Amino acid sequence: RSPLLASSAASDVYKRQVFRQMTVTYIFGPTGTGKTRSVKEGCGYSNCYAVSDYHHPFDGYRGQKVMLFDEFHSSLPLNSMLQYLDGYPLELPCRYANKQACYTEAYIISNLPLEKQYVSEQHEKPEAWDALLRRINCVRVFDLDGSHKDYTVHEYFHPCTTPTFEQIEIDDCPF
């Protein structure tokens, strides 16, 4: 056997036995604000695989470190997404030959706010919805001007309103 084949086989065995520490970011905002471009440029185009055909999502995957679920609108079954966003060794389903998942970063990119994904599952399978939320490390919200703000899932769903204080005159104080 050639050294390349031997190292490839060893690599495949290694990948099937190693937990991948995953970072998952949910990105949403209006169209044309640079959501996808920001990820591809930030991570490097050659490091990214973008799912756009949700009937055969992984046929073109070649071991890239970054997975983009682009134009996502609850496009894959929730139980499948839970597997794709977890770090356990995973074979990705493909038409001709399954592929080993090697990515450690995943981005779900959409025009929809996070709470508009999997709406029926939020009520019918709340434990699965909660499992999805636990896998998401960051919610990135893009504005029309292309600027964005990052939140944890908790911060996103429970925005903290910082109290404001007013200066009052001593005569207005009841104490």
What are these regions (language model features)?
Residues 46-77:
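AAA+/P-loop NTPase substrate/partner-engagement loops
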